[in-house]
Every structure is written in C-alpha cells, then in structure tokens.
Amino acid sequence: MDRKQLLQKAENIRANPPAFFQVAGLHELDEVTTVEDHFIKEGKTDTIHFYIIRPASEKKPLPFVVNIHGGGMIRCRDILFARRLAYASDCAVVSIDYHLAPQYFYPYQIDETEILINHLLQNAAQYHLRQNYILSGQSSGGNIACAVTLRSIQKRQLQKPALLLLAYSWLDLHTDPNDKPDDCPDERKEQYRFYKDCYLCDVDDNIAEVSPALSPSSVFREFPETLMIEGGLDELREENLRLFMTLCDAGTTVQMQFFPESMHGFMVNQKADWKKAQKIIQQKVSEVFSEKM
C-alpha cells in the first residue's frame, strides 16, 4: 500500500475501535484527579498536545511519569490508566497525545516525546512539577519509551529517567510475525505488518531505536532501572523476554512481573490480572519517587 492507502485504512480503524477499548470506570476518578490540557510548539515538530493528570487534593510540586500509550502507532487512547496511576502513586502523570502514523512516521514520535520531556524539565515550576521523572510505555508506546531512553544515554541531550516502565512492548519490528515463536492469529499478524508499514518509511528496521530486542547488551550498559510487565498469552512475549535477558547481561537492574494467563494489552484494557499489574506499577512508582525526594 502507498501512504494514501495506509492513511485510509488507519482512519477506518480509528473510527471503528474494538468493543473492549470501551473500558469500564472511565469517570470513576473525576472527583479525585484533575486533567489539564496543554499545547506547546518547540523545535521542528508540529504543536505537541499533552495532558497533565494529578491528584485533586495535591497542591505541592510533584514528580512526574511520562506515559506513552499503545495502539500500533496509529490509535489514540484514553487516559484512565494515567489517572489511576496519578491518584494511587501521588504523582503527576503526563500523557502525550503523540502524532499518529502513517501521517507522521519514525522518528517523529520519538522526537516529539524527547522535546516534551526536555520542555517539562526546563519549565518544571511553570507546570508545578519536580525535576525528576519516570518514563512509561505500553505496547508500541513501550517501543517509543525504549528509543527515548536510548537517546538519553547516547546523545546526552536528555536527563535519563529514574525508572523505565515497559508493558507488553513491541520490541522487534524486524522479524516477520510468521517467524516469531509466539502464537498469533493470522489477522493479528496482518495488523502488525500494517502497523509497521505505517510507522516506518525507508528505515532500517534492525536498528536499536526500532527493534531494541535485537540489540546487543552493550547498547544497554547505562540503562536505568527497568520494570517490565508481561503476559503469558501475549504474542510479543518472546521479544520481551529477550530484552529482559539482554538487560540482565548488560548489568541493568531489571525486574519482570509475568502473568501467565494474561494477553496483550491486558493492563490498560482491564483484562485478567490487570489490577495486580497496575498495583505493582503504582507501588514501584511511589517507591522510586520517595527515594528521589
């Protein structure tokens, strides 16, 4: 497909989300959290849209989590996960409404996330934030989070996150779904091929910013502490296990919480062991920020 055909298909997918995307409890935190709408224009990117979510009762400057949603780089998602995290961990959560593929493709989403984090750190007082942050991503958002973290190490133009949170991340865009070891229905395989075509345009799909699971341990020697959430029924399970072992070999402090009966997207889509997984993340965020105070 050419870019026009990719866009038409992506717009149709966005207009017809699966029923399970309509998660329960969307407004359950309306009274105990606040959601601020923000826009900035910096660098060569278009205007960046993001939300800052914080506990409604909290008035002091807060450390913050930057959360990058999943959706194959082509879908928008709601901010319920971010609201739960902010409320439970007594922190601010910045949810970036990154520009979607195929209109915007690699490395655009990485660039704008890096720009936003630098902006928040340099203007922390304006946003009532502290200058320490955690980076979080689910599925394709985990891919972006890995890439931004790698840049913070390699280019030294961004403060490294205090913690990296990865949930069932898409970490190998090089290997065709037919050649991956995990069970995956043919329809899902076609979806992953489509997502890749939307996100990449004349790019080597084997580089660390695109397929971190295939990179050697030397790439990750200065990686921050990392917490990984993975499901035993996730079609991306093996590439997440591979990155986990690579981080171990690199000497990174890394922990994986594995839920055998959970599938891809379970934590945000509120399936299987989602409550346990979210609680683990909430507790870890609280722990890390308390150490950095």
Give the residues covered by each predicted segment.
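An N-terminal hydrophobic leader/cap segment in hydrolases
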Residues: 1-40
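Alpha/beta-hydrolase superfamily serine-hydrolase fold, recognizing
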Residues: 6, 27, 34-293
